């Protein structure tokens, strides 16, 4: 067994962290140096020794919804008052502030990169004091930006539309991004009013049935709908000691995920409906409206809905979550878990009571890390069967099963 080691860093700008180029300064004013730059930049400071707990949440719990903003919550010890913005003698003055970078590593592997959105300072009359830091990734940043009124988009692939939104003057996304070209062809359109960037991008994602998320290193990532299909197995979890051990597995089937009639509409057009009549005969009609999609024609809308229907009409029991306790694992297994990303493929081996061992190929829908100093580090992965996230693949034992996967488009 190995001990998972966190590293928590927060960006600071202040007198003690001044790296701005300064004229007539013997230190900061040297030409041709790379340490002091115009305007200065934030400097990441290691606050691991002050951290009492951390929580990271990324992904989604409901596969019918877009990925949520990835968040992190840190609790920092502040008994000496060094993190208080009123403490002008502190090396950290003017203290932790919003908009600064937060990075969290586990055993040297990045598990979160975002910016501070909220700071709470508290203390007791007995002398205890702390700072709660909350952060959000790039998706949260997009929620505060608007695409400018009158923006004209040309007919283009979904990935090109994502890039056009990010580079729009009203959005001006400054973070790092990795945008796939996409597969869906989107119609040209001109926006009649300023439009929230994240809301519009969700229409693009619906039109692709792809994935948009901030990855563990803070890169805003767009993947097309083939993402899980092209992935190789990143980790195998087992209950027999042969692979990465997990402590708990949760399997479920829920009516909140059961939909056998799906609808969506192109801009200013009537809705298109698709039905799974077999499921409707058993459970009645359960409708899910995917809203507006930006594709060129109704036949493509039908294809998108048929793909989604493969996921939503199933009533088979599926693995919803597995939880691993990192303190019980080897160093290599801890690293393997820390490196996992949303949409990654993993394999889970499990043995329900009264049955033989089962093997499930799954895609990661959510990742949650919880750690408090003095206790164990737990990582919970939200999963969905890969058989309902991918296309039919001939001669493939998992993805080649009839009546499960969808023909590609």
Residue ranges and their predicted role:
Residues 10, 106, 165-170, 205-208, ...:
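Hydrophobic, Leu/Ile/Phe/Ala-enriched alpha-helical segments that form helix-helix packing faces
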Residues 1-154, 188-194, 198-209, 243-247, ...:
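Assembly/oligomerization scaffold segments
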Residues 127, 131, 158-161, 260, ...:
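Alpha-helical structural motif
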Residues 143, 162-192:
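N-terminal export/assembly leaders
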Residues 23, 102-103, 153-167, 288, ...:
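Short, cationic low-complexity segments
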Residues 59-89, 179-228, 234-409:
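An acidic/polar, Gly/Ser/Thr-rich interaction patch typically located in mid-to-C-terminal regions
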Residues 160-168, 303-310:
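Charged/polar, solvent-exposed surface patches and flexible loops
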Residues 96-97, 125, 136-140, 154-159, ...:
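Short, surface-exposed linear patches
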